[in-house]
Amino acid sequence: MQRYKNQNVAIKIVHKGDTPEEMTKREGRFLREVTMLSSVQHKNLVKFIGACLEPAMVVVTELLVGGSLRKYLVSLRPRSLEPHVAVGFALDIARAMECLHAHGIIHRDLKPENLLLTADQRTVKLVDLGLAREETLTEMMTAETGTYRWMAPELYSTVTLRHGEKKHYNHKVDVYSFAIVLWELLHNKLPFEGMSNLQAAYAAAFKNIRPSADNLPEELSEILTSCWKEDPNERPNFTQIVQMLLHYLSTLSPQETLAPRRTFSSENTILPPESPGTSSLMASRGDLGDTTKGKKEDKPRGFFFCFSECY
């Protein structure tokens, strides 16, 4: 945690790498992440403040102190979230993804470690666009590794694919990952429990196995099963998902939708990183407009500039 213009901020320092090849790859990923962060704005996306390339690769964002969704869920076990709370969090995630997809951005690493809570632990924000890519009609993307347990099967199902080799996939990979996160929100259990990451990937890709959607309300079960369909083209988009979640929430009684009190951390609390590969940006709530589609910055700032007031 550092301070910039009298506000606490999160600073992500990216190691430049040890070899020329690694340095080129990491700088490219850094440039891509900063370009995307600076081009979109939404209340469920971490607020971008700035970045610099030299002397170190640094990304500065708002500071979220509510902790990761992963840490929050683990703290509740063996209890589960109330359905309206779980679906409310899912709605935050779906709206963030709707915004990214509207700007042609695929996240590719949607998982609880990359979802952070505001100080009151009532709102979820999406972070870490390190694996994100802009989608074009002609682009063929590399089979880079996200986190197998949450990744869409089409990202890794071609076993002959070598590192850096190209393959086709589209924004629907995020819809599959969203379904796995939604299942986890509803059950508060690790998806594919009892399997290693590679076993879970094999089961999903080659045996078409999914976590059980039994014992859920029919409407939620239908959302899950539609989102994790094997054929990406049969999965709904996030605009449709938002509407499905809103419809489900509208069917709940007023008593069911009363939000319970939640324990929350001090705004000055510094929480540890959750797992390798995540940005670990812990932040307070930004005052951003609630625009479902998101919007571009009115005056885009320069991407790479150092912060004389950061210390």
Sequence positions of predicted segments:
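Activation segment signature within eukaryotic-like protein kinase domains
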Residues: 89-90
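Conserved N-lobe beta3->alphaC-helix segment of eukaryotic protein kinase catalytic domains
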Residues: 14-39
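Glycine-rich ATP phosphate-binding loop
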Residues: 1-18
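A conserved loop-to-beta-strand element in the N-lobe of protein kinase catalytic cores
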Residues: 54-62, 70-71
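Conserved catalytic-loop aspartate of Hanks-type protein kinases
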Residues: 174
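A short, aromatic-enriched beta-strand patch in the conserved N-lobe beta-sheet
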Residues: 50-51
